[in-house]
UniProtKB/Swiss-Prot annotation:
Protein's name according to its UniProt entry: LL-diaminopimelate aminotransferase
Function noted in UniProt: Involved in the synthesis of meso-diaminopimelate (m-DAP or DL-DAP), required for both lysine and peptidoglycan biosynthesis. Catalyzes the direct conversion of tetrahydrodipicolinate to LL-diaminopimelate.
Cofactor requirement: pyridoxal 5'-phosphate
Organism, scientific name: Chlamydia abortus (strain DSM 27085 / S26/3)
Gene behind the chain: dapL
Catalytic activity from the UniProt record: (2S,6S)-2,6-diaminopimelate + 2-oxoglutarate = (S)-2,3,4,5-tetrahydrodipicolinate + L-glutamate + H2O + H(+)
Similarity remark: Belongs to the class-I pyridoxal-phosphate-dependent aminotransferase family. LL-diaminopimelate aminotransferase subfamily.
GO-annotated biological processes: lysine biosynthetic process via diaminopimelate, diaminopimelate-aminotransferase pathway
InterPro entries per record: Aminotransferase_I/II_large (IPR004839), DapL/ALD1 (IPR019942), PyrdxlP-dep_Trfase (IPR015424), PyrdxlP-dep_Trfase_major (IPR015421), PyrdxlP-dep_Trfase_small (IPR015422)
Sites of N6-(pyridoxal phosphate)lysine modification: 236
Length: 398
């Protein structure tokens, strides 16, 4: 059998697996070094007791012949869909438009698969690598990278001479940690409706938004129901990174150019390819949603982020984002070349970061810091960063 040629279009290594390999190699060479990993956005705050209690009860039911149940509904437990509609969307989205999944990554893949090959995809530059990789794997015809720079306040420059099928937008953004305001999202929604495009809106970090003037969902914007699909996740907010649970919204108003509803095909795809998420996980999520918006984990990560921001600025770095998101986008002085920036932080500070260029060409000259670690690690990293100004450091000969 011939290989799927789409794989030949991918980078040899996924960004974060390459970072892990570099960290492991450094540890072998320097076993005495204490490395603080602020690169990958993994979580550190434990599950809430109410979530654990509900999960345990649900598992015990599966061990009792009287309460055992097998397959659950493919589209998600009705009680969880209703809870999400109430808490996150305040009735703007009906439970029937909410679909429970195992997380945003698989949602993104299924959405691209839903619309099929040959499409033109637009992504923010810099952006989460999964959008481009998934577009390549599913046979997209063209990928347009839209520059998001400090000069544009990290808002994508919308092309006027390109027909876009799927517009990938992440807000709060990974990697820049910045958030699009209502006016910016309205501009994107108006463009999509005028052009017949679909916005794939990644709201995985919406729980970090504390400013009431900022939208937490694309469906806060008038007109979005006819042009957008939203994905979200409990990985960061409830600590479900290893438990796995997310959801997506496909509005009934969203139609193909022939007038057929997209939601019909979406349900058909799920019925064929998916048997639903683990029932105890879904039931524990119902308890978790009741905790919103006052989440201890989010407060923990916000505190970490404030410590990092203060330390980085004290060390004379220019810092963007991190106030409404768990990521800080840090501009690196010109005397540190992009090809050396990961090794610079690893050797000089014993801190692992994510090089900005891994998120796209507009990420050159930047690195991403994650505030999702343990506070004691964040404090130690801040102490190392503030020992000297970055302008007093020298690039090591690596």
């Amino acid at each position: 059998m011939r290989r799927n040629t789409n794989f030949s279009n991918l980078e040899a290594n996924y960004l974060f697996s390459g970072i892990r390999q570099k960290i492991q190699a450094f540890r072998k060479q320097h076993p005495e070094a204490s490395i603080i990993d602020l690169s990958i956005g993994d979580t550190s705050y434990p599950l809430h007791t109410s979530v654990i209690h509900t999960f345990t009860q649900s598992v015990e039911k599966l061990g009792n012949p009287k309460t055992y149940r097998g397959y659950g509904p493919e589209l998600g437990l009705p009680a969880l869909r209703e809870k999400l509609s109430e808490v996150f969307y305040h009735g703007q989205v009906s439970p029937e438009e909410i679909f429970i999944s195992e997380g945003a990554k698989m949602d993104i893949f299924r959405i691209f698969s839903l619309f099929g090959p040959g499409k033109t995809i637009a992504v923010q530059d810099p952006s989460y690598p999964v959008y481009i990789d998934t577009a390549l794997l599913t046979g997209s015809r063209k990928i347009i990278k839209l520059p998001c720079t400090k000069e544009t306040h990290f808002f994508p420059e919308i092309p006027q001479d390109e027909a876009i099928d799927i517009f990938c937008i992440c807000s709060p953004n990974n990697p820049t940690g910045t958030v699009l305001n209502r006016e910016q999202l309205k501009e994107l929604v108006d463009y999509a409706n005028a052009q017949g495009s679909i916005i794939l809106f990644d709201a995985a970090y919406s729980a970090f938004i504390s400013d009431p003037t900022l939208p937490t969902s694309i469906f806060d914007i008038p007109g979005a129901r006819s042009c957008a699909i939203e994905v979200n996740s409990f990985s960061k907010s409830l600590g479900f990174a290893g438990v796995r649970l997310g959801w997506n919204v496909v509005p009934k108003d969203l139609q193909y150019n022939d007038g057929l509803p997209v939601i019909r095909d979406w349900e058909r795809l799920l019925f064929t390819t998916f048997n639903g998420v683990c029932l105890p996980v879904q039931e524990s999520a119902i308890a978790g949603v009741s905790l919103f918006p006052n989440l201890e984990a989010i407060s923990h990560y916000r505190y970490n982020s404030s410590l990092l921001r203060e330390a980085l600025q004290k060390a004379d770095f220019s810092v963007y984002g991190g106030e409404q998101a768990p990521y800080l986008w840090v501009e690196v002085p010109g005397h540190i070349p992009d090809e050396d920036v990961f090794d610079f932080f690893l050797h000089h500070y014993h801190i692992a970061i994510t090089p900005g260029k891994g998120f796209g060409s507009c990420g050159k000259g930047y690195v991403r810091f994650s505030s999702l670690g343990k506070t004691e690690d964040i404090v130690a990293a801040c102490q190392r960063l503030t020992l000297t100004s970055v302008y007093d450091t020298m690039v090591l000969s690596l």
